[in-house]
Amino acid sequence: MNEETMRKVARFINETERELRTVFDRIEEIEYVNQERVLNAFCSEKVSARHFAQTAGYGYDDIGRDTLDRVFAKSLFCEDALVRPTFASGTHAIFTALAGLLESGDVMLAVSGRPYDTLETAIGLDDNPQPNSLIRNGVIYEQVDLNQDGSFDLNGIETALNRLENVKVVYVQRSRGYAWREAIAPESMKPVFDAVKRIKNDAIIVVDNCYGEFTLETEPSSFGADIIIGSLIKNPGGGIAPTGGYIAGRGDLIERIAARLTVPGTGREVGSYAAGYTQFYQGLFLAPHVTAQALKTAVLFARVFERLKLTTMPASNSVRSDIVQALRFNTAQDLVEFCRAIQAASPVDGYVVPEPWDMPGYNDQVIMAAGTFIQGASIELSADGPIREPYTAYIQGGLTYSHGKIAVSRVIHSMIRNGSVRF
């Protein structure tokens, strides 16, 4: 690529960045509010160096673990929380919560359409449900799809609530998974929550909050969610937490889930962590800022692709409720080349060339760019997508906005070399 083309690309990106100043200002205002709330949670719980210590054995009276639970709960507008390094993924945390709340004969009503692929298997929505999946254990699954515009089908939800007996859990997925829709803002969930409390007051509202924490000034718990769940290698870990997940919400429900987390009769009172808790506290403290960096990166990608006349979701000026940006391509090869360009702009394994593969838990081959310090950490700049029509890449994360801007530039360079765009 000649120097003149490279200068044109740099000017193009700088012009795009200037267009986004108002959007970036809004993101920074949200960051400030969230940072102050997290700081207040730390101060309220008198966090000190003793809370970071390593623990071993049963973990009785582990003040680092128990204080971290309370700091997380306050940061997310909740009564209580279980924050555990032992959650292997967000799906693991979600399944633990659902399995702790649902018994044989109970109905799980999903009101945001079909969950994403890995949770489908955990629920038992495959043709042959796996052992220990919810359906194999006697749980009844029902579903109400979203409207075509991505909004809740409130009439359909109310009809289902009136028709079904034994609705124990009403389930909402905040982020899009591999669906072509915007994430659901917490405020938009309130009419559903109100309907649930009016029609089935004893039903438990559970929200998969993955990718959404700290993107707005509120969380689903601000509007009536009973339980919210997420992964520490996404937003709330701040790019620092090396593993884990959280379940937060009503105190009585957290105690019930804790009996499933370990064993009945012991619950949350056990569970040590030999590596110590420093990274989890520090990650939470950094989370509002790192999430804002990821949002700015997503917005820049969106606006650049809009200016290149490609299809994006959400639009660059949309109010965002998660860190994910969807970008649509004409061919499978364009999708693959995009992910390869993201990988090449990564600090870890930047020399690796991603290939589509049969990823456990997914029904189609998936291409993933994940040159991350922490394996699978989608708060770090990463991209992925299933190899199926319409060919869509889902890009998320970015520990620093500068890295995101560099990655945008290198993606454009790759597209020029491949003949996808011209400058």
Question: Can you say where each PLM-predicted feature lies in the sequence?
Answer:
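Conserved C-terminal alpha-helix-loop-beta "cap" of PLP-dependent enzymes
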Residues: 306-423
